[in-house]
Amino acid sequence: MSNKSNESSKSSKSSKLSKLSEGEEKKMDDEPPIALNLGCGKNILPSEQGWINVDGMKNDGVDVVFDLDDCRTSPLPFDDDSVSVVLLSHVMEHLHHTLPLMDEVYRVCKSDAKIIIRTPHGASDDAWEDPTHLRGYFPSSFEYFSQPMYWRADYGYKGDFKSEVVNLYIENKVLKDDTNEEIIRKVMHERNWVSEMEAVLSCIKPARKADKQLRSVPRLQILKRGPDLNPEGQNGIGAQGKQMKEVRNDSKDNVVELVD
């Protein structure tokens, strides 16, 4: 067979593969987005909405049994760039190996995928009274899942998530006649004011450089909740309470300003 015939054969084969690839991509675009409920425990979310419930224990409703602390040696059982939403609700504070997990979450997430992380506030008793809690989290903790934060230290972490907003929840029963400024001061400096945090992160691909100048600070929102404000309790993802006041963290030195 001549070189010309070989080239023609290769071109034809390449064209068929290209068409097949385009068809597969279209099929993938038509499929519902994948959403991972990692460390779901008993908080099972509906599969008809695209949720895959993952936990280290095989309980009712768990779709995939996987120990998240195994991410140092075993990959999450999902394809690269396949996931649109990840929920980690009261999981992170229980883990020994946080960065390996976030590396794996980064691998499986599409660009601009949303990651919702809920934890107790590090300055609350809820963060430490449970003997299975290994570490406390604060509003700035989620910035360590971004590459720009590693401008002065390299821990081998390769993922890059931008911390967009951190919701700080206050129970309505603790509020009295405090002014807005007093509430903000107490939230930022006193114990047991914030009962829970909810961070919303975006997956950045390709990853940014480990450059201090690229660091961004999340927007902070203070919200109140209680039986009279949120009778249905937690359900899926998203805000769980009624907004009380919003604060903005515009400085890279973590200065908080009141937004009217």
What residue ranges belong to the model's regions?
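A generic short-segment signal for beta-strand/edge and adjacent turn/coil regions
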Residues: 21-23, 30-35, 85, 112, ...
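General secondary-structure edge motif
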Residues: 14-17, 85, 122, 181
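Conserved SAM-binding loop
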Residues: 33-123
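Conserved N-terminal segment of class I S-adenosyl-L-methionine
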Residues: 2-5, 10, 16-75, 216-260
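S-adenosyl-L-methionine-dependent methyltransferase catalytic module, highlighting the catalytic core
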Residues: 99-100, 110, 114-260
